[in-house]
């Protein structure tokens, strides 16, 4: 009896230790996330989704292009990459039958809250879903592009508006009402142009002055943002202020980057697997 009691206690202690280690890992992931963001901006920390939307917004008008039908799915891809970078989800390890990025399922690593409503809502969906789904399927489900009525519950609604409200709270956007003949629309003009210009310059520098010609040597968040900006069709907005020569160079380098084989690049570093899986999903769609 004594032996069983001690063994049970050791098991309980072991489980508590595992939970403590996992909790500490999540805290470290979030702390690393904060440190990376602080390196970019000492005052304001943005998620990948917020950065993509900010790049897509017209500064004065406060809305994205009516012709852009890519940004919705791009924002959902940003959510998956953000969760992976924060240590909440990961791709299942490759096997003989499942080597390709788009064949491997998205698995839950930790369900501890991130503090971001959209991220935590997605995390709950991923946790509750059986069987597990692939990156491409999750982007479709979160966007609402599914023929299965039982899976419409996974659609994230009003994503752009919710992200815009976050940016309003962070002092980057403001909220206005504009009349468009037949209807009124809520818009979010940019008020903190310094923050947007910092973001634009960061991406411009990544393919010009700081170009390394090797995605494995790039900052992970910068790589992710370039992939998402391309997939969301807002990359041209980033380079539009450049001179003709620099514009051509930047676009060509960005094109070379996103035309790399995700399957090859994804095997080089596990930390960037989700980035390349998201790119592979957009390449296929």
Curated annotation (Swiss-Prot):
Belongs to the GOLPH3/VPS74 family. It comes from the Eukaryota. Its main location: Golgi. A 1,2-diacyl-sn-glycero-3-phospho-(1D-myo-inositol 4-phosphate) binds at residues 67, 76, 157, 160. Phosphatidylinositol-4-phosphate-binding protein that may antagonize the action of GOLPH3 which is required for the process of vesicle budding at the Golgi and anterograde transport to the plasma membrane. It is a peripheral membrane protein. GO terms for biological process: Golgi organization; Golgi to plasma membrane protein transport; Golgi vesicle budding; positive regulation of protein secretion; protein targeting to Golgi apparatus; retrograde vesicle-mediated transport, Golgi to endoplasmic reticulum. Homooligomer. Does not interact MYO18; differs from GOLPH3 by its inability to interact with MYO18. May interact with ARF1. One of its GO terms (molecular function) is phosphatidylinositol-4-phosphate binding. GO terms for cellular component: cytosol; Golgi cisterna; Golgi cisterna membrane; Golgi membrane; trans-Golgi network. It comes from Bos taurus (Bovine). The modification Phosphoserine is found at residue 112. Residues 10-23 have a biased composition (Basic and acidic residues). Residues 176-187 are annotated as: Beta-hairpin required for oligomerization. It is found in: Golgi apparatus, Golgi stack membrane; Golgi apparatus, trans-Golgi network membrane. Keywords: Golgi apparatus, Lipid-binding, Membrane, Phosphoprotein. InterPro entries: GPP34-like (IPR008628), GPP34-like_sf (IPR038261). The keyword Membrane applies. PANTHER family: GOLGI PHOSPHOPROTEIN 3-LIKE, TRANS-GOLGI PROTEIN GMX33. This is Golgi phosphoprotein 3-like. Residues 1-39 are annotated as: Disordered. The keyword Lipid metabolism does not apply.
């Amino acid at each position: 009896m004594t032996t069983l009691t001690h063994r049970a206690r050791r098991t309980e202690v072991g489980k508590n230790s595992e939970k403590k280690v996992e909790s500490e890992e999540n805290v470290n992931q979030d702390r690393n996330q904060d440190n990376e963001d602080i390196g970019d901006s000492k005052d304001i920390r943005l998620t990948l989704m917020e950065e993509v939307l900010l790049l897509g917004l017209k500064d004065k008008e406060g809305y994205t292009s009516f012709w852009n039908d890519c940004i919705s799915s791009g924002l959902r891809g940003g959510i998956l990459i953000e969760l992976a970078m924060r240590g909440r989800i990961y791709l299942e390890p490759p096997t003989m039958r499942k080597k390709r990025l788009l064949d491997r399922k998205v698995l839950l690593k930790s369900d501890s809250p991130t503090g971001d409503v959209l991220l935590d809502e997605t995390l709950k969906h991923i946790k509750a879903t059986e069987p597990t789904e692939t990156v491409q399927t999750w982007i479709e489900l979160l966007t609402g592009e599914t023929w299965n009525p039982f899976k419409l519950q996974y659609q994230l609604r009003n994503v752009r508006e919710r992200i815009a409200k976050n940016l309003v709270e962070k002092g980057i956007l403001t909220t206005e009402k504009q009349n468009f003949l037949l209807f009124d629309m809520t818009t979010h003009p940019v008020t903190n142009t310094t923050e947007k210009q910092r973001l634009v310059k960061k991406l411009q520098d990544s393919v010009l002055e700081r170009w390394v010609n090797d995605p494995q040597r790039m900052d992970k968040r910068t790589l992710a943002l370039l992939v998402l900006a391309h997939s969301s069709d807002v990359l041209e907005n980033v380079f539009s202020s450049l001179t003709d020569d620099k514009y051509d160079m930047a676009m060509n380098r960005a094109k070379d980057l996103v035309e790399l084989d995700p399957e090859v690049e994804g095997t080089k570093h596990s930390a960037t697997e989700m980035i390349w899986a998201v790119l592979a999903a957009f390449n296929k769609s």
